[in-house]
């Protein structure tokens, strides 16, 4: 009898375990998901960031932030193993209580808002340049002139493309647009490498068009709006001097206050901590070794993509790259135009994903689960229109990305993981507590420095 019962138990248990295992995500897909979680609109600002610190310092910062973000994820993995919570805010609640859960949700909420504002700026800029290409040499009727203006293009895209899917109750299908966005970034990277290989150092900057803004030469993709051709002419007539030797040549290391301005941009480009916890929770056999493998290869891919992209841009434009590297290339560049359209299309449908996350965060923070849907829709409309307004009045992507990375990126990557790791070390019987406290203190200190100094320098610039 007992033998028969044991056989029954065995038959019941084995299929159940196998069924759960089949639903888990395999290791290679986890690598792609984590890579996809970090790579986003921030990659477009990295060429400008490298141009401010030099290619050698840029490589050092890529290595540092890759290792820094990787160790932050491994700290979170230890806390995840202890709490078994499958969300970032969930492990915060398990370690510190409900107040810390609310704090994490607010940071994630503001981070999403900043990302959406960055998307709005990119969409507006790229649509503006795409339309200038399509209308080149053509007479636009006076009644349709507004369709060639950057602000109106963003308004139209927001109302007719971005807002409708943002108001959907469920937008699961839009999750696949991230694949389109990554494809667009890969395409842009290949084109940038091709353009770099077919010119000499700073060659693209020498042939680019410029405008004079407060006695500073700024690269202008639209030739119709430009005042000067080449940085030699612009420097003499706008700045009243010879071209800056630092900006007009390739430099390995540049030491000035701009270093503090680019730290938030590098931080933003490596932030994957929010996505990391759900990925590990859904991973097949999430042992320490397998999770470490995922983190290593994900950030190796991120490093490779960032280096190919930003170094190609820096080689061609040196220190003159626009804050969004796409805005450095001429509007009439057909190969870049394809990339502009792909990324604009993808971001228009990726934007609602963050809008949905913002709406869900508000529902959770204010306990609005049973609230009428029209009220939640109103919240979404206000959020989308607010980001659109930011996109209309700001066209400098590095400012939005800089502030978002400085305050919220530093919090998600360094400050929050360090606080969680502090408490985990205190309440568990882990070995080498002194090392854990030292590591957490380093992360907390550096996170606070990036948040404060990065924000101040970005706002001043």
Please state what every model-predicted region is:
Residues 6-18, 22-24, 28, 74, ...:
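Membrane-interfacial loop- and helix-cap regions that link adjacent transmembrane helices
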